[in-house]
Curated annotation (Swiss-Prot):
Residues 1-20, 150-270 are annotated as: Disordered. There is a cross-link at K26, K204, K230, K271 (Glycyl lysine isopeptide (Lys-Gly) (interchain with G-Cter in SUMO2)). CDD domains: SCAN. It is found in: Nucleus. This is Zinc finger protein 174. Belongs to the krueppel C2H2-type zinc-finger protein family.
Length: 407
């Protein structure tokens, strides 16, 4: 009996093992070819799946089986759940619909989830976003707010350009105020002798003649200013042979006595009074000052007027950078040039004298018309040196460069 029971048990175990092997074989047939131990890169599998061409295989059956195999290698259904596979498909489609510049940057970071992709795209938008600028424009009698962009550059008012006038000596510009011009007179000879500037031999004053020179300068400050504009600035040196023994040389002006501490410490101001050791040229004093217009100031009436007013009377107008004489009657804005005022008035009147011959659109400036005509001609003169992409405006090219540099 025991032997019979052992035989029946062994036969049952063999039958069950045969059934298990049969089931495993059927499952392997349904699953297809076994997976390789070393799984390839999912990104490479995705690219192979997307770039697969029908011409690479002999027929439709082989093409379909090849696509199935590439898709399984990419999605790996044996390792991933349905939700993970759906996430991969959504991520791929989301990357596909992104702009090319953003898509390239996101793929370079190799995100592992859709949340990472969204974070990268938001960071990119936050970095490239600028605060919008608005400008008020009068159109058909009504003020309208328009966003200021590169294409609307011609419609906006350019910032006022104020040229910097070069430094001129006192022969061309108006002299300093009386408070500044008299600073030199208020300093006594005792002060100049103790000044740290006078480390080298200084001009000697002849006894009681120095106070007389100071009194002469105070009595006639206009004469001092007029003669100070020319090379020999010491007016008392010519009155009856008094004053300094060695007058100033050519090229000196009245601004030199008012030396500040910065000028003392600079290398250019190491020897500020060395010119007293040289003599002026007599021929330079005798000929040019006779015909100089400042010499006629002594003969003019109204001696109480300031020297700047007399210069204006002689035709010396103030520089254009100091005034904006052209004023808009509508908004009160002032301009330096009349052409700027005319251009500004088009904002209020809505005048657009420049018309496009292709579509009939009108513009307020000729530069804006040229930018607009590039739309019709297809001209894109600004090209990126890294990727070769062309743009119509330089501002768009600058914004594109930020994508390469990651600004």
């Amino acid at each position: 009996m025991a032997a019979k029971m052992e035989i029946t048990l062994s036969s049952n175990t063999e039958a069950s093992s045969k059934q298990e092997r049969h089931i495993i074989a059927k499952l392997e047939e349904k699953r297809g070819p076994p997976l390789q131990k070393n799984c390839p890169d999912p990104e490479l599998c995705r690219q192979s799946f997307r770039r697969f061409c029908y011409q690479e295989v002999s027929g439709p059956q082989e093409a379909l089986s090849q696509l199935r195999q590439l898709c399984r290698q990419w999605l790996q259904p044996e390792l991933h759940t349905k939700e993970q596979i759906l996430e991969l498909l959504v991520m791929e489609q989301f990357l596909t619909i992104l702009p090319p510049e953003i898509q390239a940057r996101v793929r370079h970071r190799c995100p592992m989830s859709s949340k990472e992709i969204v974070t990268l795209v938001e960071d990119f938008h936050r970095a490239s976003k600028k605060p919008k600028q608005w400008v008020a424009v009068c159109m058909q009698g009504q003020k309208v707010l328009l966003e200021k962009t590169g294409s609307q550059l011609g419609e906006q008012e350019l910032p006022d350009f104020q040229p910097q006038t070069p430094r001129r000596d006192l022969r061309e510009s108006s002299p300093a105020e009386p408070s500044q011009a008299g600073a030199y007179d208020r300093l006594s000879p005792h002060h100049w002798e103790k000044s740290p500037l006078l480390q080298e031999p200084t001009p000697k004053l002849a006894g009681t003649e120095a106070p007389r020179m100071r009194s002469d300068n105070k009595e006639n400050p206009q004469q001092e200013g007029a003669k100070g504009a020319k090379p020999c600035a010491v007016s008392a040196g010519r009155s009856k042979g008094n004053g300094l023994q060695n007058p100033e040389p050519r090229g000196a002006n009245m601004s030199e006595p008012r030396l500040s501490r910065r000028q003392v410490s600079s290398p250019n101001a190491q020897k500020p009074f060395a010119h007293y050791q040289r003599h002026c040229r007599v021929e330079y004093i005798s000929s040019p000052l006779k015909s100089h217009p400042l010499r006629e100031l002594k003969k003019s009436k109204g001696g109480k007027r300031s020297l700047s007013n007399r210069l204006q009377h002689l035709g010396h107008q103030p520089t254009r950078s100091a005034k904006k004489p052209y004023k808009c009657d509508d908004c009160g804005k002032s301009f330096t040039w009349n052409s700027e005022l005319k251009r500004h008035k088009r904002v209020h009147t809505g005048e657009r004298p420049y018309t496009c011959g292709e579509c009939g659109n009108c513009f307020g400036r000729q530069s804006t018309l040229k930018l607009h005509q590039r739309i019709h001609t297809g001209e894109k003169p600004y090209q990126c040196g890294q990727c070769g992409k062309s743009f119509r405006q330089s501002s768009n090219l600058h914004q594109h460069h930020r994508l390469h540099h990651g600004d």
